[in-house]
Amino acid sequence: MRRFKRKHLTVVDCHHLARSHLAVTQPFSQRWTNRDPNHGLYPRPRTKGRNRGRGCQRYISEFFLAGHQHCTNDMAKSNSVGQDSCQDAEGDMILTAESSCTLPQVDNGEARLGSSGSAQPARKRAHCFEEATESGQWDGVTKKTPRHRLFPSCSRLREARQGAEDSLSQCSPVPGEAGRDIEDIGPDPLPDSYYGLLGMLPCQEVPSHICRLPSEVLRHIFAFLPVEDLYWNLSLVCHLWREIINDPLFIPWKKLYHRYLINEEQAVSKVDGILSSHGIEKDSDLCVLNLIRYTATTKCSPSVDPERVLWSLRDHPLLLEAEACMRQQLPDLYAAAGGINVWALVAAMVLLSSCVNDIQHLLFCLRRPSSTVTMPDVTETLYCIAVLLYAMREKGINISNRIHYNIFYCLYLQENSCTQATKVTEEPSVWPGKKTSIQLTHEQQLILNHKMEPLQVVKIMAFAGTGKTSTLVKYAEKWSQSRFLYVTFNKSIAKQAELVFPSNVICKTFHSMAYSHVGRKYQLKKKLNLFKLTPFMVNSVLAEGKGGFIRAKLVCKTLENFFASADEELTIDHVPIWCKNSHGQRVMVEQSEKLNGVLEASRLWDNMRKLGECKEEAYQMTHDGYLKLWQLSKPLLASFDAIFVDEAQDCTPAIMNIVLSQPCGKIFVGDPHQQIYTFRGAVNALFTVPHTHVFYLTQSFRFGVEIAYVGATILDVCKRVRKKTLVGGNHQSGIRGDIKGQVALLSRTNANVFDEAVRVTEGESPARIHLIGGIKSFGLDRIIDIWTLLQPEEERRKRDLIIKDRFIRRWVHKEGFSGFKRYVTAAEDKELEAKIAVVEKYNIRIPELVERIERCHIDDLDFAEYILGTVHKAKGLEFDTVHVLDDFVKVPCARHNLAQLPHFRVESFSEDEWNLLYVAVTRAKKRLIMTKSLENILTLAGEYFLQAELTSNVLKTGVVHCCVGQCNNTIPVDTILTMKKLPITYSNRKENKGGYLCHSCAEQRIGPLAFLTASPEQVRAMERTVEDIVLPRQEALLFLVF
C-alpha cells in the first residue's frame, strides 16, 4: 500500500495555531502579505492528467457547495400525510432565503457584499481562482502561470493558499514530503471532527456530507425548514437529528405556532397564559404596546449590536415611524442601557407594515453583513409575533388579519424556497398550445413521492391556481410503469388533458364512459334526449288532474335527485322538501304531493329505461339518466392502477359510488371552496369521502400577494377557513384599481353580462369583445326569439319575424309572452328568467343591441379587449385583470358601521354564494378591480388600506382635516403618527381618493393599533364621529324584511 502523503498536525499543534495571533480558523481576516503565514494549510489542486475520483472535492470549500441531488424514481412510500425521499430531503438543505425574501436591488449595494467587502460571493471567488490560473506545482517546483489578469480577490486567495502551504510544510513531521511528486497525493478527504487538519488514513471510511456537521450548524440549517419536514422526514434520519429537532430549545416559537394552529391543548394554554399575564387582552387599550414589550423580552445572541442593526435598517421605509413610536410610547425600550431594544423595534415595524413587501424588506435589511442578528433569531421573533397576533384574533381583539398574513407569507416563501426545483411545462386551459414553465413546490413534491396502492383513497386539497393539473401530469410521468385513468366533468378539459398527460394516462369524462357502455344503445334507437328534462316536457305526460308546471317541476326535481344519488331505488326521500307555489312563495311540500311526485317520477323513469321508440320527449333517455344506469350496473375498471378524479368538489354521490367501488387506488383532486354546482346535486367529495392520505396545495402560481390576500380573507371571514392559508408568488399584483393587460368582466348572472356587453360596445369606437364559451352558448338567438314573442301578432307578420327556437315557438299559439313568463317563474328556470329580464329592460333596442354585440364579438380571445362571462363559465380560466361586477353577495357597509345593521350576519348567506365570489377573485393574475362590497368584506378582517406616516410630515403644508365626510376633527400636532387611507377605484368606476384620518376615526377602524400613533388619552379627547349609512333601496328593503 502506498503511503498516504499528507501534512499532519497534532492536536497540540492545532490548539497552538488556534490560540496564536495568526488565527488559523480565520486566515482571511489577517493582513495580506506576499507570504501568508498560514501557507500550506490550504488543500492543493491536482496538476497533472490524473482524474479525481467521483464525488471528491479539490478544496475544502467544495464540501459545503455540494450540488443539489435530484429525486430518483425510487421514492419511499409516504405516511398518511406524505413524506419526501432521502435524496429530496438532503437537497432541500441547500436554502437560499434571498430567492424568496430578498429585494431585487438596493441602492447602496451593501446587501450583495460579503464580509470581506468583495461584491462577489465566496463560492464565485473560489471558482474564479480555479478558472483564472493554470495548475502548477507549489513550493518552488513550478509556479502558477496566469491565463488572464486576475481579480484582486482571486489573486489574494492564490497568494493565501501559497503562503499557507509553505507554513504547513514547516510543521510537517515527515521531512522531504514537499519535494515529492504531487501527482501521488490523493484527493482531500472529507472533513472529520477536526475538519481534515489532522489528516486521514487511507483505509478510513469517508463520512457522509451533512451528517458530520456539528450540531450547531445542523440546528442553524434545520431552522430554515418547514415544521412538517422536520417532524415527518428529518426526525426519521438518525438519532442525532431527532434529538436536535425534539430539543425544547430548538425553534420553540415556530413549534408553538404550529401547535397552536392545530389547537393542541398545551399550546393553547401556554399562549393564553402569555396573553393574560402580559396585558394582551380585549379590554386593554395598550394590548398592542404590551405585545411589543413582550417581544422585547425575546432572548438573543449577546453579539447583537443595536447600533449596527440600526445601520442595517437605515433605508427601510418604516424605520423612522417605528423609532418615533418607540421614542414616544415605549421610552424605556428606546433608551435602554445597551441601546435600543432590537426586537421591540422589529415588532413595531412589523405592526406598522401595510404589505408583505415591508416585511420582506425588513428581512433583507437584517440579512445584511452589517447586521449582527442571526436569521434563526429573526425567524423566531416573527413566529412569536405571529402566534400572538393569531391568538389575539381568536380572543376577539380588534386586530387586522393583514399583519399576521404578511408575516406568514414571508416565512412561507422563505421556508419553501428551492434553488433547483423541478421545472414543469404546463399548458393553461385559457390559451391552448401556449406552454409556461413552472417550478414544483415542496407540497407538490410530497405528492409525487407517494406511491399509490390498491384501495387507497388520496385527497389533494388544492387552492385556486396551485397547479393541480401539472401535479397530476408529473405524478403520471414519475410513475410511468402504472396505468392511470383521468376523469373530469368537462369535455373540453378532458381533450386538453389528452395533450399534456403522458401515454400511460387515459383521459375521459364520466358521461363519455357511461355513453360508451349504456348511452350508445339509446342513441341507436333514437331515444336519446340531447337536452335537459324540463317541466314543460313532463307536464305533457302527467296524469289527468295531476298536471301543472309546479307539479311537473316537482317531478323533474325528484328525478334529478335520484340521478345524482347513489341509491338503487327511487323513493320518497328523493322528493324535495321545499317548492314554490303559484304565488312564487317558498312553501313546504305536503305529504300527499310527495307521494304523487314519487309515483309520477317512478312511472317516468320506467318509460325512460325502455329501449323501444317513443314520441313523447319526457320518455327519452337523458345524459344524467344513462349515467345513472351505468352506475347501477356496477362497472369495473380493473385495467387501471389508479384513478384521478379532477374537480372532485363537484362530484355527485352517484359518481363517487362508481369511483369508490373500484379496487384500484383513487386520487380526488379539487378545491373545496370552488363548489358552485350544488344546485345540480353535487356534494363535496373532498369533505364527505373518507381518505387514507391527504395532501394540500396552498401556493398559487397564478397571482401575487395582494390577490392572494383577498382570496384568503374571503375564506377566513366568510367561511372561517384559517388552518390552511392561500399564498401566491413573489410577483407583483394590485387590487386598488389600476389595469394591466387583458380585462375580464366577470358576473354572477347572464343578465349582467349582457349589460356590460352593451356598455363596452357603445360609442364611436366599440371595443372588441369575447363571450366566454362562445356567442352561440350565450343564447343571443333565444333573446331575439323571446323579444319576437313579446311583439304583437300583427307586428310579427308585418316585419316577417320568425321564432327559431322550437320550445319558445310553442307559446305563440298557447298563452303568448305572459304565459311563457309564468311558466319560467313556476319552473324556476334561471337561464330563461335572465333572458326575459334582458328583453323587458331593453325592449325595442334588443335587435340593434344583439346585432352590435355579434358584430363586435371575436372568437379568438387573445385579440379581445374585454372578455365577458359568468363565473360558472370562467371557472378554470385566468386573466390578467379581472373586474368583479356588482351582482354578487353583498356586505352593505364596513365593519365599524355594522353595529347599525344588527340583523346582518355573514352566516346567513349560503356557502355557494361565497364560493362564487372566491372563484371570481381568483381568476385574476395581475390586477383585481374590486367592488365596494368586496372592500367591506376585507374590513371585516380589519383591512382598511391604511398607511402610517409621521405627523410632522403630514402637517408641513398646514392644518389637515380628517378625510371622513362627516368628521370635523383635524390632525393634532402633538401626535406621533397619522394614518392615511390609500386611494382605490371600484369596478363601477367610482373612486375613493382616500386621505388622512383623525386618530378617533382610525381607532374605530383598526382598534388598538391606533394607540401606536397617539396615546389613549389623546384619542379619547377627540370627537367621535358616527357615519350615516345610505343603502341602495333594494338592499334597504331586504334588511327591513329579514
Swiss-Prot record:
Q: Where in the cell is it found?
A: Nucleus; Chromosome
What pathway, per the record? Protein modification; protein ubiquitination
Q: Which residues bind ATP?
A: A462, F463, A464, G465, T466, G467, K468, T469
Q: Which GO terms describe its biological process?
A: DNA catabolic process; DNA damage response; double-strand break repair via homologous recombination; negative regulation of double-strand break repair via homologous recombination; positive regulation of intrinsic apoptotic signaling pathway in response to DNA damage; protein ubiquitination; replication fork processing; response to intra-S DNA damage checkpoint signaling
Catalysed reaction, written as an equation: Couples ATP hydrolysis with the unwinding of duplex DNA by translocating in the 3'-5' direction; ATP + H2O = ADP + phosphate + H(+)
Task: List residues of the UvrD-like helicase ATP-binding domain.
Answer: 441-704
Cellular component terms per the entry's GO annotation? chromatin; nucleus; SCF ubiquitin ligase complex
Q: Which GO terms describe its molecular function?
A: 3'-5' DNA helicase activity; ATP binding; ATP hydrolysis activity; DNA translocase activity; double-stranded DNA binding; single-stranded DNA binding
Q: Please state the Enzyme Commission number of this protein.
A: 5.6.2.4
**Key words of the record:** ATP-binding, Chromosome, DNA damage, DNA repair, DNA-binding, Helicase, Hydrolase, Isomerase, Nucleotide-binding, Nucleus, Ubl conjugation, Ubl conjugation pathway
User: Gene3D superfamilies per the record?
Assistant: 1.20.1280.50, P-loop containing nucleotide triphosphate hydrolases
Segments carrying the region annotation (Disordered) are: 31-53, 165-185
Motif PIP-box: positions? 57-64
What residues does the F-box domain cover? Answer: 207-256
Subunit composition and interactions: Part of the SCF (SKP1-CUL1-F-box) E3 ubiquitin-protein ligase complex SCF(FBH1) composed of CUL1, SKP1, RBX1 and FBH1. Interacts with RPA2. Interacts with RAD51. Interacts (via PIP-box and RanBP2-type zinc finger) with PCNA.
What does this protein do, in the record's words?
3'-5' DNA helicase and substrate-recognition component of the SCF(FBH1) E3 ubiquitin ligase complex that plays a key role in response to stalled/damaged replication forks. Involved in genome maintenance by acting as an anti-recombinogenic helicase and preventing extensive strand exchange during homologous recombination: promotes RAD51 filament dissolution from stalled forks, thereby inhibiting homologous recombination and preventing excessive recombination.
Q: Which family does it belong to?
A: Belongs to the helicase family. UvrD subfamily.
Q: Share the domain note from the entry.
A: The PIP-box mediates the interaction with PCNA.
Report what the protein is called: F-box DNA helicase 1
Organism this protein belongs to: Mus musculus
The coding gene here is Fbh1
